[in-house]
Amino acid sequence: MKYFFYPKRRFVTFALIMNNNSKSPVSDLQYQQLLLRMEYEYEKEEFKRQTETMGIARKVKRGLCWYPVSPGRSYYNSLNQLVIDITRTENKEIEHSFEFGRPVCFFHQSFDGKVKYMNFIATVSYADEERIVVVLPGAGAVIELQADSSLGIQLYFDETSYRTMFEALEDAIRAKGNRLSELRDILLGTQNPGFRELYPVRFPWLNSTQETAVNKVLCTRDVAIVHGPPGTGKTTTLVEAIYETLHREPQVLVCAQSNTAVDWISEKLVDRGVPVLRIGNPTRVNDKMLSFTYERRFESHPAYPELWGIRKSIRETGSRMRKGSYSEREGMRSRMSRLRDRATELEIQINTDLFDSARVIASTLVSSNHRLLNGRRFPTLFIDEAAQALEAA
């Protein structure tokens, strides 16, 4: 079994790679599709079973649910998403599994113990020990939540991650005569990776094995794999390889299976003075970790106050248009159009500035499919803890 990664120009993966005896890369990936479908169906049924049979108290203890919770203020975040603060009022000492990007659902428990789920799905934007910020589908959801006095929140089955992985497998299976097909065949063992000859770089602060690994990474044209037992310094080697690669390339993408691993790499790179842009929110929340997240950087941009004001005007104008007469609506349409054009212009400007100033873009594997990264290309992709991920991720 080998790990397949979404295509970039070349890959540096840090994983334990096992033998694969499949007949061809395509048949291997088709088999992975079957395995992923089995896992998808199992998790879906397990979620259904937990939802229908597992009591709230047990789900709370497992970190899958908060109950009771208190809805706080609702507002539009820097990405112009409608969000609401959710705070748990009991069992604050229990660790939970809520984190950025995970879907959630809300429920109400009546006096007789019956649970009724609300008819919408939300997404976690931020989570710490006592508070979750949730992206809502619309203003109606805010009204529904704030009117409920016996509210709970729990993790929902993650269709989005599975959909992303199925699409990645399908893209790789259909690839023909392009860079994706080359990397697919290399990663699955039917084509040898290429390496360039470079004069070895000395790293006196690394041991000889780590130094050799970094130099091997620098010489690769396609794929390099660094593997070894736990505690042998693979992540240290990864950080050094990234740092050295940035002497040769303007920007790289760094991914890991878990948010915790992405946080760890990002923090180490920031300590080395590398400008990092973190897609998604960290699991450990402090000013240092938040300072390089996309949302915090977006809000700190000099053009953001103007953008915030324009977005507010758009919402207010839209509200007046819905309430006004036909002639009034016609008069406001041109204003709305100008406001939207200016908002789009500012969003593009801020987004361009943030990505142009970053040397490392960091995210989980699934979050690398985030809309913010659509259409972007990176000369090199680094993946930490690759053996912990599903092939499709």
Regions found by a protein language model. Name each.
Residues 229, 257:
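P-loop (Walker A) phosphate-binding loop of NTP-binding proteins
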Residues 7, 13-97:
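Charged, low-complexity interaction regions that mediate assembly/partner binding
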Residues 385-386:
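Walker B catalytic acidic pair
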Residues 14, 19-37, 91-215, 267, ...:
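Pre-ATPase regulatory/linker segments immediately N-terminal to the P-loop/RecA-like helicase/translocase core
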Residues 233:
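Conserved glycine(s) of the Walker
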Residues 190-191, 195-199, 243, 251, ...:
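Conserved P-loop NTPase motor core of helicases/translocases
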Residues 237, 241:
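Hydrophobic positions on the alpha1 helix immediately C-terminal to the Walker A/P-loop
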Residues 220-226, 250:
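Pre-Walker A (Motif I) flank of P-loop NTPase domains
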